[in-house]
């Protein structure tokens, strides 16, 4: 994978932010360009625009997804450590190159579909660091409503929190919880690319999209309209020199993904909890946090897909 990022936080000496990033990997290609004015109209009001194009070759989902779009956003403080962001997004989604032997429920959704959506995000954040927090709390409530034009008609809600507590010097306990639900309205069902997916970095010990509703006749993951997940993690010194920025982690993850609008004898959709345990190492690199985790499932369904090793870049919440 090759990743390239440029961020100028004081464009032309006016405090404006311009960011460009591109990711080239075997399974996805991403281009993102964003501009933010932090003091729009000389007020504590941020305004921004985002442009993006994302192509994902999703072998585990039996189809490729191409997303092209743009968004506008405005953010403002509502209380100490609390900020509200309002946004609008328009994008074109193209489900393409569907495998010939893919699930009927996937093949039926092949083609282009536009999404026009308004959103809000309310964030409360008291963490001492965005990159490597040792104490504090971040909570996030997000709502997106699609149907202001476009083809998609759905309402998506997400609520999550992550709490960090130092039990002694460099020994940090973190607790994470998140849940979400999406539903269609009018005559529209929730489409496969609008659902939630669980696994990989969101539920270690399981493959990306390895948990949740599945067409067992083709072994294709279908995503779910509802999910919950949680994690308990202990971070501690690795025993190596502190200036290397390497830490050790032990954790347990749990969660579940369920509910699809499709129905049929071949769809497995259990609401049962999945649970895994594991450990890993993280490195505070100049480019951001890099982690290697090893995890194994303790509770799972027969049709779930396991994953032993997971490499990740960046923060998890």
Which residue ranges define each predicted feature?
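Gram-negative/organellar outer-membrane beta-barrel architecture
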Residues: 1-138, 203-205, 209-220, 225, ...
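Secondary-structure transition/capping motifs at alpha-helix termini
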Residues: 10-14, 39-44, 78-82, 161-171, ...
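Short, glycine/acidic-rich beta->alpha junctions
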Residues: 27, 64-66, 153-157, 272-273
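C-terminal outer-membrane beta-barrel translocator/porin domains of Gram-negative envelope proteins
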Residues: 89, 94-261, 265-266, 301-303, ...
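C-terminal structured "cap/appendage" subdomains that terminate the fold
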Residues: 257-305, 309
């Amino acid at each position: 994978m090759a990743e390239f990022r440029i961020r100028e936080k004081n464009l032309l000496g006016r405090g404006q932010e311009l960011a460009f990033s591109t990711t080239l990997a075997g399974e996805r290609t991403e281009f993102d360009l964003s501009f933010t004015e932090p003091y729009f109209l000389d007020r504590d009001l941020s305004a921004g625009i985002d442009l993006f194009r994302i192509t994902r070759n999703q072998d585990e989902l039996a189809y490729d997804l191409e997303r092209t779009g743009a968004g506008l956003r405005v953010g403002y403080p509502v209380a100490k450590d609390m900020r509200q962001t309002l946004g609008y997004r328009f994008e074109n989604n193209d489900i393409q190159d569907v495998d010939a032997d893919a699930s009927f429920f996937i093949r039926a959704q092949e083609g282009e579909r536009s999404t026009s959506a308004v959103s809000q995000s309310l964030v409360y954040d008291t963490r001492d660091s965005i990159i490597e927090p040792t104490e504090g709390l971040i909570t996030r409530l997000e709502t997106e409503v699609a149907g202001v034009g476009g083809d998609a008609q759905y309402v998506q809600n997400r609520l999550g929190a992550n709490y960090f507590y130092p039990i002694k010097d460099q020994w940090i306990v973190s607790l994470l919880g998140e849940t979400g639900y999406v539903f269609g309205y009018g005559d529209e069902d929730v489409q496969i690319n609008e659902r939630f997916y669980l696994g990989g970095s969101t539920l270690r010990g399981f493959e990306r999209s390895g948990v949740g509703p599945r067409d067992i006749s083709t072994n294709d993951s279908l995503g779910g309209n509802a999910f919950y997940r949680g994690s308990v993690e202990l971070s501690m010194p690795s025993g190596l020199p502190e200036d290397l920025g390497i830490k050790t982690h032990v954790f347990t993850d749990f969660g579940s993904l369920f509910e699809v609008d499709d129905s049929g004898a071949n769809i497995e959709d259990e609401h049962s909890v999945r649970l895994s345990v594991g450990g890993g190492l993280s490195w505070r690199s100049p480019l951001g946090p890099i982690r290697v985790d090893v995890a194994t499932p303790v509770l799972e369904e027969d049709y779930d897909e396991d994953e032993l090793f997971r490499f990740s870049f960046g923060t998890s919440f």
